[in-house]
């Protein structure tokens, strides 16, 4: 799609937004219902596209993308009317005989730039929030998941007028053309370097942005943890989508006292989940493309492999791999892995573990396995990270009742459920004041008696 076509799409959506059609709550709900029905109708196509792009099994496709997206859309449908109503606020004495309220209004013409690793979930969830809030939307899916992008375009073309929602496929040229346009809101999910570029381009028009980025999310296991449960949940979170998950445990920090037992249990769980030959397992996915495959494989140090390590370039598959005895200056610790490699480091004290994490860029997620509530609270309260779990991994994403987002280097802003609606809304504060009483204290000319009254009310 060329620059002129993109400019026309944005212009058409801006003209449509100015008709105020998206302000009607029933119209928003109807749009969400159409989206839900289109996703349901295309479930086989979605599953096939995910198998093509990422090798995902149908079970994983439904659990992590189709079903989760439908749940979020259903949540938005159920609550959009209540969220859209004005919210009454208390009035102080300065605004006596007034009604004070906040009114959520849509930003306008919005851009959603989606990633390739969960191409439906990470497109449909922000889309549902944007529609619930009353915006028009241009979606730019990733060129690295072409089969999924094509199905997304088909879903949106069937469900929406292009003046409301349009999908723009393509690569870097289309990204550049889109970022040259003036948007009222940009929602980006992807890498930290690209997120910085998006924010820089958005700043030229002072466009607000939500950035869902990534980072090296730590998983801490102390000596009190239920190791069997920890092993199963770590294996699930790490090797789901073959590690291509923004909140996957990136590395393991384990107390030296339980190191050997925990690694033995994780190895057992990997074999139980994927078999003795995971590269032959049809339900075990593949790396998205050859470039990413080469990068991830290059992070494997053969001298530190204690599980897996084998890669098959023809199918873009890499075994679930554990690296033990990893040092902080190893290559695998210098970047987000985004693949099926789990580096293992040890600590002697909680102070050592906390310092190791806080000396690095703020991660998107953190996971602490411990039966000690004081330890749990220490990491939850005092270590900066976007969100996380106690005695589990990645499940803080699987709800519409809490927001999800990063901080610092892992992003800004939140979405899911109410937070999605708020992310795509501007809150207007309105004072509606009666005219039957007009207190004179604030008006010039000022006098000492007026000043006394003002001090009674404002102090």
Please place each PLM-identified region on the residue numbering.
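N-terminal Rossmann-like NAD(P)+-binding subdomain of aldehyde/semialdehyde dehydrogenases
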Residues: 1-101
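Residues at or immediately preceding the N-termini of alpha-helices
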Residues: 6, 25, 43, 227, ...
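Structural signal for hydrophobic packing residues in well-ordered secondary-structure cores
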Residues: 17, 21, 36-39, 43, ...
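Residue-level signal for inorganic ion chemistry
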Residues: 28, 73, 134, 165, ...
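Conserved C-terminal structural/oligomerization subdomain of aldehyde/semialdehyde dehydrogenase
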Residues: 220, 271, 317-459
């Amino acid at each position: 799609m060329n620059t002129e076509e993109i400019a026309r799409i944005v212009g058409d959506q801006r003209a449509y937004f100015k008709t105020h059609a998206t302000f009607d709550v029933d119209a928003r709900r109807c749009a969400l219902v159409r989206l839900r029905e289109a996703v349901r109708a295309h479930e086989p196509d979605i599953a096939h596209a995910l198998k093509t792009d990422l090798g995902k099994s149908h079970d994983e496709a439904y659990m992590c993308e189709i079903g989760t997206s439908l749940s979020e859309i259903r949540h938005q449908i159920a609550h959009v009317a209540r969220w859209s109503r004005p919210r009454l606020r208390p009035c102080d004495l300065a605004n006596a005989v007034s009604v004070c309220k906040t009114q959520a209004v849509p930003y306008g013409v919005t851009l959603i730039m989606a990633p390739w690793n969960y191409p439906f979930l990470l497109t449909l969830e922000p889309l549902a929030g944007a529609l619930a809030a009353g915006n028009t939307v241009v979606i730019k899916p990733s060129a690295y998941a072409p089969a999924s992008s094509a199905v997304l375009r088909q879903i949106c073309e069937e469900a929406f007028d292009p003046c409301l929602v349009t999908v723009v496929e393509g690569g870097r040229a289309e990204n550049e053309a889109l970022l040259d346009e003036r948007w009222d809101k940009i929602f980006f999910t992807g890498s930290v370097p690209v997120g910085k570029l998006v924010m820089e381009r958005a700043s030229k028009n002072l466009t607000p942005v939500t950035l869902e980025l990534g980072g090296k999310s730590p998983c801490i296991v102390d000596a009190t943890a239920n190791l069997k449960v920890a092993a199963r949940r770590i294996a699930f979170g790490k090797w789901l989508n073959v590690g291509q998950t923004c909140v996957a445990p990136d590395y393991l920090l384990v107390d030296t006292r339980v190191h050997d037992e925990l690694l033995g249990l994780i190895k057992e769980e990997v074999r139980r989940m994927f078999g003795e030959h995971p590269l032959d397992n049809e339900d075990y996915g593949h790396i998205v493309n050859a470039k990413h495959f080469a990068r991830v494989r290059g992070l494997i140090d053969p001298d530190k492999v204690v599980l897996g390590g084998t890669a098959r370039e023809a199918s873009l598959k890499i075994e679930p791999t554990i690296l033990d005895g990893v040092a902080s200056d190893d290559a695998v610790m210098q970047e987000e892995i985004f693949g099926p490699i789990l580096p293992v480091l040890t600590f002697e004290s909680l102070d050592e573990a906390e310092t190791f994490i806080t000396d690095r860029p703020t991660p998107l997620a953190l996971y602490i396995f411990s039966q000690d509530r004081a330890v749990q609270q220490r990491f939850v309260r005092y270590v900066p990270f976007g969100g996380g779990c106690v005695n589990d991994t990645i499940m803080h994403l699987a709800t519409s009742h809490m927001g999800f987002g990063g901080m610092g280097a892992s992003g800004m802003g939140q979405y899911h459920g109410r937070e999605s609606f708020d992310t795509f809304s501007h809150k207007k504060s309105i004072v509606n004041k009666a005219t039957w009483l007009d207190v004179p204290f604030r008006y010039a000319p000022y006098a000492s008696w007026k000043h006394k009254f003002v001090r009674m009310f404002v102090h």
